[in-house]
């Protein structure tokens, strides 16, 4: 789950993809697949899943991940009477599509790829069964849902032969509208229903689930005939059309149209050769493939790498390339991630890179098509960090860009309005290049700054003084930037909640005592504690200087040390409530986004016992409470 959390925290998967190795990607794919197929929960998007699969093919083409179908069933499982495979995927790649077309002469059935829960329905000796796909070999028996979901059982009873048919349990866009406030998407909704125990299924919710069929396994025939048989039986059938031929452009057009017009969520289209084929008993059929389209990318030539120091002195690469137009937008810059990426991929003038617009917003490099002769590194002194990932200015404290960024951060963090990086730059250029110098500035001093008129000088001065009047030790620790990367309000708050006077009480002689105390705080390891205490003497010196000019207010913890949620972890599902989160934290607890063995309480929407988090909480024996019960008990 650590890799999944890393992906979720990133602005875009492309931003962290270069840092993931094959093992990382296999973990992310395995965990997300397990959640997707066993709980109905999508930890990552379909696009992110496909990107990770493509990257894994580059790093480890023989990975076991590529042989997996679905995910192993959790809980009671049954052997499926027929193999339930998946589909090979082809992107918007003209060569790959043409290669497939050369093998299969058509005609072709193009149908919707429904984004629901894959299942198998069988009738044998007049006995009807319904199964989930599971891992293709073993699934769950969910026959109990047949009397609850939106399917006419009478139609099945009229079928007077043994059959095996595949379909998708899915909720229509229209039906899902009533649930969109409590569930992220229709698939998660259906997944929760499917994974509920028979006695816990919400019947009203289940009644909104359709079963759409798309394959007749037994009796076998060409696909168009299979779909016709399903219609003759009166069952709901996937949307499809028959084509004499097609190309990539037609597939893109069909996909775009179906995403707009389909009454159900689809995550692609399925292309099948419309001739009779021997059904495969393992792997995926060669005569069909899934087409999901492709995120537009384009090759371009690197002009240079621009290195800019961060407030911590880390030199951050930004790549300027020959201007290109992608998705109707002109692009000429992208992130270079870090120095290691630039060096490993030899990115410099003349390199050819492939660029994608992530989410149609930010451009990222997907891969390097042709490296430069050598990487484009900065012409200033720098050192590598201990991990060999970033390069850092050799002389951080005297770099003007670093000084400006640190001062800007200080002003922003203390709440000094209108003191932007532009204003800070002018102050530094005028010689006011330290925090003590700036907080001691008079209104007359501001008037000496180039471009400052009386009104602006008065405004900036008053805003600064107002923020300094309310400055407490927590804000000062965060704004100072003395403790460096990895430290922010949350970590400082954790320390001050327990030891509010640590700044005044710490001495070198008591270092070992404080080290033991801080290691007892949740989330603090040896590296964090060593870094914090290592910088404490520097912060104490800074604090004394600042305290001569203004009075720093002490930190007053809002946390009740004997609170009713002391050392407890609460999870909300189906809703968010900032006031309740603050209440729980002030009472000594914390709010998490996922259910685990460390969860103390799950609060869920009334009637939402079918949600994946609720089911997991019950499996782990975690206490649960409805939203209305929580409100009645704790809101006054």
UniProtKB/Swiss-Prot annotation:
Under Pfam families, the record lists:
BRCT, DNA_ligase_aden, DNA_ligase_OB
Taxonomic superkingdom: Viruses
- Keyword flag Nucleus: no
Q: What is the effect of changing residue 36 to A?
A: 90% loss of nick sealing activity in vitro. Complete loss of ligase adenylation activity in vitro
SMART domains, A to Z: BRCT, LIGANc
Q: Which GO terms describe its molecular function?
A: DNA ligase (NAD+) activity; nucleotide binding
Gene3D superfamilies assigned: 5' to 3' exonuclease, C-terminal subdomain, BRCT domain, DNA ligase/mRNA capping enzyme, Helix hairpin bin, Nucleic acid-binding proteins
Q: Which InterPro entries match?
A: BRCT_dom, BRCT_dom_sf, DNA_ligase, DNA_repair_Rad51/TF_NusA_a-hlx, DNAligase_adenylation, DNAligase_N, NA-bd_OB-fold, NAD_DNA_ligase_OB
Task: List each coiled-coil range.
Answer: none
Kindly state which keywords UniProt assigns to this record, in alphabetical order: DNA replication, Ligase, NAD
CDD domains listed in its UniProt record: BRCT_DNA_ligase_like
Q: Per the database record, which ranges form the BRCT domain?
A: 560-636
Q: List the disulfide bonds.
A: none
Record function comment: Catalyzes the formation of phosphodiester linkages between 5'-phosphoryl and 3'-hydroxyl groups in double-stranded DNA using NAD as a coenzyme and as the energy source for the reaction.
Protein name in UniProt: DNA ligase
């Amino acid at each position: 789950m650590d890799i999944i959390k890393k992906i979720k925290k990133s602005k875009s998967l492309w931003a962290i993809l270069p840092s993931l190795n094959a093992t990382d990607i296999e973990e992310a794919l395995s965990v997300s697949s397990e959640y997707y197929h066993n709980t109905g929960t999508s930890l990552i998007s379909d696009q992110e899943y496909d990107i990770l699969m493509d990257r894994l093919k580059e790093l480890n083409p023989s990975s076991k991940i590529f042989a997996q179908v679905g995910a192993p069933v959790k809980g009671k499982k049954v052997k499926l009477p027929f193999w339930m495979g998946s589909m090979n995927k082809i992107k918007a790649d003209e060569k790959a599509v043409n290669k497939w077309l050369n093998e299969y002469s058509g005609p072709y059935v193009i149908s919707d790829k429904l984004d629901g829960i894959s299942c198998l329905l069988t009738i044998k000796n007049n006995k009807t069964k319904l199964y989930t796909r599971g891992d293709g070999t073993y699934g769950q028996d969910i026959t109990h849902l047949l009397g609850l979901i939106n399917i006419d059982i009478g139609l099945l009873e009229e079928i007077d032969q043994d059959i095996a048919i595949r379909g998708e349990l899915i909720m229509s866009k229209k039906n899902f509208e009533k649930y969109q406030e409590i569930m992220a998407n229709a698939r998660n909704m259906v997944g929760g229903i499917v994974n509920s125990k028979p006695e816990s299924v919400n019947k009203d919710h289940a009644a909104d689930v359709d079963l759409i069929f798309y394959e007749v396994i037994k009796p076998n025939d060409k696909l168009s005939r299979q779909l016709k048989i399903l219609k003759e039986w009166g069952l709901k059938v996937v949307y499809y059309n028959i084509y004499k031929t097609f190309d990539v452009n037609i597939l893109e057009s069909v996909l775009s149209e179906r995403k707009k017009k389909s009454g159900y969520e689809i995550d692609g289209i399925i292309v099948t050769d419309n001739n009779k084929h021997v059904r495969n008993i393992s792997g995926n059929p060669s005569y069909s493939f899934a087409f999901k389209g492709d995120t537009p990318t384009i090759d371009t030539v690197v002009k240079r790498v621009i290195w800019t120091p961060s407030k911590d002195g880390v030199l951050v690469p930004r790549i300027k390339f020959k201007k290109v137009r992608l998705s109707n937008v002109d692009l000429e810059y992208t992130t270079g991630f870090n120095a290691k990426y630039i060096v490993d991929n030899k990115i410099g003038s003349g390199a050819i890179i492939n660029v994608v617009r992530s989410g149609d917003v930010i451009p990222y490099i997907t891969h390097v098509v042709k490296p430069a002769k050598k990487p484009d590194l900065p012409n200033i002194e720098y050192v590598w960090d201990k991990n060999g990932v970033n390069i850092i200015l050799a002389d951080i404290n005297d770099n003007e860009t670093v000084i400006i960024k640190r001062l800007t951060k200080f002003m922003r963090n203390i709440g000094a309005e209108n003191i932007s990086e532009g204003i800070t730059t002018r102050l530094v250029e005028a010689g006011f290049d330290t925090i003590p110098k700036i907080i001691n500035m008079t209104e007359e001093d501001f008037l000496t700054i180039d471009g400052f008129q009386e009104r602006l000088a008065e405004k900036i001065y008053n805003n600064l003084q107002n923020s300094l009047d309310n400055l407490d030790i927590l804000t000062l620790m965060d704004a100072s930037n003395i403790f460096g990367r990895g430290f922010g309000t949350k970590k400082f708050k954790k320390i001050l909640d327990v030891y509010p006077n640590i700044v005044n009480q710490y001495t070198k002689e008591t270092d070992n005592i404080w080290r033991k105390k801080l290691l007892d705080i949740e989330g603090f390891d040896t590296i964090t504690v060593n870094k914090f205490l290592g910088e404490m003497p520097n912060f104490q010196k800074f604090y004394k200087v600042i305290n001569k000019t203004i009075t720093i207010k002490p930190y007053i913890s809002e946390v009740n040390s004997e609170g009713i949620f002391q050392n407890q972890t609460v999870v909300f599902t189906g809703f968010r409530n900032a006031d309740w989160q603050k209440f729980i934290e002030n009472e000594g607890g914390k709010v998490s986004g996922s259910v685990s063995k460390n969860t103390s309480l799950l609060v869920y929407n009334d009637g939402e016992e079918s949600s994946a988090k609720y089911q997991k909480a019950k499996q782990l024996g975690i206490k649960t409470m409805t939203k209305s019960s929580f409100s009645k008990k704790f809101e006054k």
